[in-house]
Amino acid sequence: MPINVPSGLPAVKILAKEGIFVMTEKRAIHQDIRPLEILILNLMPDKIKTEIQLLRLLGNTPLQVNVTLLYTESHTPKHTPIEHILRFYTTFSAVKDRKFDGFIITGAPVELLPFEEVDYWDELTEIMEWSRHNVYSTMFICWAAQAGLYYFYGVPKYELPQKLSGVYRHRVTKETVLFRGHDDFFWAPHSRYTEVRKEDIEKIPELEILAESDEAGVYVVANKSERQIFVTGHPEYDRYTLRDEYYRDINRNLKVPIPANYFPDNDPTKTPVLTWWSHAHLFFSNWLNYCIYQKTPYKLEDIH
């Protein structure tokens, strides 16, 4: 999928080298089809790395996508240069009168805090409430999935005995367009200290569990219309993300396990094995095509 992003975004050069089609604004205006308008609320500390990971996946189908990057006004990013934020990102107050075909809310390293103690929780709940009637389909990733399930449906999160880190085998539990083309079993990364539980989700008639893992638990949950999709893992992670997180934690003297099913021979000095790439690309492609492009109104103002 050609993606139309602001000129000068660092991700553009990297993705172009990988063969991802990044379209200039001048070329984009000459296409007759309406581009999909996708909003990304980037809550991850390393925003540039997350941009690359998500844009890589959004740029993998034949449709044109216009991407708008969003940050929270109530929290000042500490790990990304403010110049980058001011140049490439916008605020909720600047977009709240617009409508979007799709919306991605990323994970965030705040999962051990009660939701209400997260410093941008009030702003996030305002944004999530806004998404009900101003976005056709929203994908919540990792902590955002827990936050969305809690805010919309009252699903609690639970602290795990130790960090869940690694790549785990999952199975599709319900046939749906999101998993069209998937094998019955596939692999996906997780990196978190908390979980949502199957028994809590099964009590809510509006929700369906679409994929799960014996080791990592619930993976993908969606409402009946698939306009809200909750992903408890990190399919967007690249080959080295779990490795980098592991060494970061070790350097902080944290007691964390070696990421499971990731390093050959469970040896952190060896190059990690990439086993989830086809799932990640197909999952995002299916979301864009089946959950958004084939269902969203042609006129954005008709989204409600």
UniProtKB/Swiss-Prot annotation:
GO MF annotation terms: homoserine O-acetyltransferase activity; homoserine O-succinyltransferase activity
Main location class: cytoplasm
Active site residues of this protein: C142 (acyl-thioester intermediate), H234 (proton acceptor), E236
HAMAP family per UniProt: MetA_acyltransf (MF_00295)
Cited InterPro entries: Class_I_gatase-like, HST_MetA, MetA_family
Family matches, as PANTHER family: HOMOSERINE O-SUCCINYLTRANSFERASE (PTHR20919:SF0)
Location of this chain's protein in the cell: Cytoplasm
SUPFAM superfamilies: Class I glutamine amidotransferase-like
Keywords of the record: Acyltransferase, Amino-acid biosynthesis, Cytoplasm, Methionine biosynthesis, Transferase
Annotated catalysed reactions: L-homoserine + acetyl-CoA = O-acetyl-L-homoserine + CoA
Pfam families, sorted: HTS (PF04204)
Family according to the record: Belongs to the MetA family.
Function: Transfers an acetyl group from acetyl-CoA to L-homoserine, forming acetyl-L-homoserine.
Protein name per UniProt: Homoserine O-acetyltransferase
Site feature Important for substrate specificity, where: S191
Residues reported to bind substrate: K163, S191, R248
GO cellular component terms attached to this protein's record: cytoplasm
Site residues, Important for acyl-CoA specificity: E111
Enzyme nomenclature, EC number: 2.3.1.31
Gene Ontology BP term (one): L-methionine biosynthetic process from homoserine via O-succinyl-L-homoserine and cystathionine
